[in-house]
Amino acid sequence: MGQKIHPVGFRLGITKEHLSRWYADPKQYPALVQEDYKIRQHIDANLNNAGISKVLIERKADQVDLEIHTARPGVVVGRGGSGIEALRTGLQDVLGDQRQIRINVVEVNRVDADAALIAEYIVQQLERRVSFRRVVRQAVQRAQRAEVQGIKIQVSGRLNGAEIARTEWVREGRVPLHTLRADIDYSYKTAQTIYGILGIKVWIFKGEIIPGQEETSAANAAPLPRRKSRRQQFEDRSEQ
């Protein structure tokens, strides 16, 4: 079951928290959930080059609090805070009212240990028609330098323009999806290529979270084993 279920949803309430944290009358839930979706869509569309990792949403009466985790806070804030003001104005237009919107920007410290940012990097490279083998190898190397305990990357679709779609994946280190106390960071994104859509999934194992103790630091854990001149486990069928 751990291989099929969403790694974050599987651990909600154990080691993961909801990205939307608010309470409302049951009759208002559908409208507020749709608002959250529109907010995330607007942020992704207008800040697609800012390296957005995640967006946390909280609600207090007539106030909406947003916490944007990004690898490039300067792009989000803008010169003199102009980016924040433009984003706030756009969100008020999306919501259709003048509710107060507070935006807090948080910088992601370990960019190469964030599944969403690694998946976004792979998407950008694939859309530039770079070979998926090279992209996956570079992404794994970046994660190794960030000293994560394990990473798994899966790419699906018409890889390198092959006639028949297939799925290829590579894993380095440990990625224990069945262990609930394991801190698994997961992301899924799609790349629009001239041959069609490619699906990218990234799992990153950062350590174990034990109740009553702090999270096992990836820096103190043993880094991923480096293997000498081992070829990636890919099968080339692009010319068949």
From Swiss-Prot:
Gene3D superfamilies reported in the protein's UniProt record: 3.30.300.20, Ribosomal protein S3, C-terminal domain (3.30.1140.32)
Alphabetical list of SUPFAM superfamilies matching this protein: Prokaryotic type KH domain (KH-domain type II), Ribosomal protein S3 C-terminal domain
A GO MF term: rRNA binding
InterPro entries recorded: KH_dom, KH_dom-like_a/b, KH_dom_type_2, KH_sf_prok-type, Ribosomal_S3_C_sf, Ribosomal_uS3_bac-typ, Ribosomal_uS3_C, Ribosomal_uS3_CS
A Pfam match: Ribosomal_S3_C
Domain KH type-2: 39-109
Subunit field text: Part of the 30S ribosomal subunit. Forms a tight complex with proteins S10 and S14.
Family, per entry: Belongs to the universal ribosomal protein uS3 family.
Name of the protein this chain belongs to: Small ribosomal subunit protein uS3
Highest classification ranks of the organism: Bacteria, Bacillati, Cyanobacteriota, Cyanophyceae, Oscillatoriophycideae
GN (gene name): rpsC
